[in-house]
Amino acid sequence: DKKVLENQVNRMLDDKKSNRFIDDFLNQWLGLGEIDATTPDEKLFPEYDDNLRQAMLSETRLFFRELVDKNLSPDNLIDSNFTFLNRRLAEHYGLQLEGEQMVKVSLAGNSPRGGLMTQASVLKVTSNGVATSPVKRGNFVLDKLLGTPPSSPPPDIGSIEPDTRGTTTVRETLAAHRDVESCASCHRKIDPPGFALESFDPIGGYRTRYRSTGRGEKTKRQLRGRPIREYREGPAVDASGMTES
């Protein structure tokens, strides 16, 4: 009976034990359980700490819980006008908010945030700790959100090493792979959604320039009231791309 099934599902979701189910589901689906698999470079991302890490995870879990509890449209997974923040995470997102408790926050229409792929936890697990990976993020979008996973790469294709010295951008590094015939067809699908997220750094902060440990200009940013000297402002970020029609 459809009504009986619906009542039983609602009963289970209303139980506090369902929080563990949601946590486990998100760990498997989005890979949130891998958030500690990489450690952000302390020189490039000195602001990353456990308080920020905890807030990142809480945002995604509370966001998904809200979708379930309010029976909201799955469109919110791609683009939403709200999220959950506390002071620490809001600061990371360039927003102002008081208090350490996570609360529901409305997002402005011109905000770069909205949906799962702009949440710091997801952006963190789709990076390697030092640099972003348009390939990894593009794969994530195609596989986890669109259900159209690309083919595995050829076995003889080497890995892409990040350049933190500010001499080459990720786009320039990836160009070599796109020029290989056996790679080109997949990269035409993978790269555009991956590059669309290139304005978000490995810990989910919004950026217009890459951070560099070598070349670049001194940053005007501050960390806890002191000037940041650990990194410089490197090349400009290019988040452009075009998907196949």
Model regions and ranges:
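Sequence context surrounding c-type heme c attachment/ligation sites in exported
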Residues: 90, 104-244
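A cross-family structural signal marking well-folded subdomains
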Residues: 2-140, 151
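Aromatic- and Gly/Pro-enriched helix-to-coil junctions and flexible linker segments
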Residues: 1-3, 7, 11-15, 28, ...
